[in-house]
Design a protein with these regions (language model features):
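Hydrophobic alpha-helical transmembrane segments
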Residues: 1-176, 180, 188-318
């Protein structure tokens, strides 16, 4: 048996080299279509709010159970292979499909390149691929801020959280987490359709991300020190501002990044033409620019490597 920490490192290396395959048969894409079908099947169009919540909870339970059982079944099958490392290889592949640091980095790098090139219209279009806010009126600083916030916050659910659950429950638990996070991204909206129907999916995602988000905050502070950013300020802003984020977990990723880079995140966003204000994270010592996107990506990768190293060291003694 290969230590699980080394399997996690191998999955991260594979993602770094290959990235996330863009295919309709990618397991997460297949999972998304499955969730979409259950959404259409179980949503009670004329039901009460209580019924919508109950059916949404049923959908959430079904997806979590089926996802976990699928991963467990694949691993049990792999254990029957004539090679001793078969199950380890399958675990690595499953985890590889659950993490997406390279995809996250590329999304930020694409926006950075367009902003540096001066193509604000294309940068706005690319920002629209990764956020739900209106992008038509974004200036350069707003486009960069959207990219920074996305990379920072998604370091939790796209990298650290899957690794965390893999460390504690192997590939099946990492797959279960990815299923929960995918449901939240599809159903966790506060609109007429999903306010009640998607509430359980959103709450499950919040609960699962609670510990990984706080670990990510600490890792960002450590990464800031290692990279020569302002680690002390990252810690100060994490403590001061994280709780102000509308998400119970998002601030623990965004606040230390803002502090490390001496920028201010949050503020005014527009959704479907309506103005929304989100609490500020950090202080505006510097105007946000494209270069801060690259700084956030460096923090993301360094935090990931730190997690893997700590995971390996912990596995040596426990």
């Amino acid at each position: 048996m290969i230590p699980s920490s080394l399997i996690a490192m191998a999955a991260f290396f594979l993602d770094t080299v290959l990235g996330d395959p863009q295919s309709r048969w990618h397991p997460v894409a297949v999972l998304g279509r499955f969730i979409g079908r259950l959404d259409r099947l179980l949503y009670p169009t004329n039901g009460s709010n209580q019924r919508k919540f109950a059916m949404g909870a049923l959908l959430t339970l079904l997806v979590l159970c089926i996802s976990y059982a699928f991963a467990e079944g694949v691993l049990l099958t792999a254990h029957q292979l004539p090679v001793t490392w078969g199950a380890d290889l399958v675990s690595m592949i499953l985890l590889y499909f659950c993490i997406s640091p390279r995809t996250l980095a590329k999304a930020g790098q694409d926006i950075y390149a367009l902003l540096v090139k001066g193509d604000l219209a294309a940068a706005r279009e690319h920002v629209g691929y990764i956020v739900g806010r209106d992008t038509a009126q974004l200036d350069e600083a707003d486009a960069a801020r959207a990219a920074i916030e996305t990379v920072a916050e998604n370091t939790v659910d796209g990298v650290i959280a899957p690794l965390f659950f893999f460390a504690f429950g192997g590939a099946p638990l990492a797959v279960l987490y990815r299923a929960a996070n995918t449901m939240d991204s599809m159903l966790g909206y506060k609109n007429e359709r999903y306010l009640y129907f998607g509430r359980m999916a959103a709450r499950v995602d919040d609960v699962l991300n609670f510990v990984p988000a706080r670990i990510t905050g600490g890792l960002f502070v450590m990464a800031a020190f290692l990279l020569g950013y302002d680690g002390r300020n990252a810690l100060n802003i994490l403590v001061r501002d994280a709780a102000g984020h509308p998400s119970p977990n998002g601030g623990h990723a965004e606040a230390p990044v803002a502090g490390a880079l001496h920028i201010r995140l949050g503020g005014v966003n527009y959704y479907f033409g309506e103005r929304h204000f989100r609490a500020y994270m950090g202080d505006a010592h510097m105007e946000i620019s494209a270069k801060h996107i690259l700084g956030t990506i460096r923090l993301m990768y360094t935090a990931t490597v730190l997690f893997l190293l700590l995971y390996y060291l912990f596995s040596l003694y426990y």
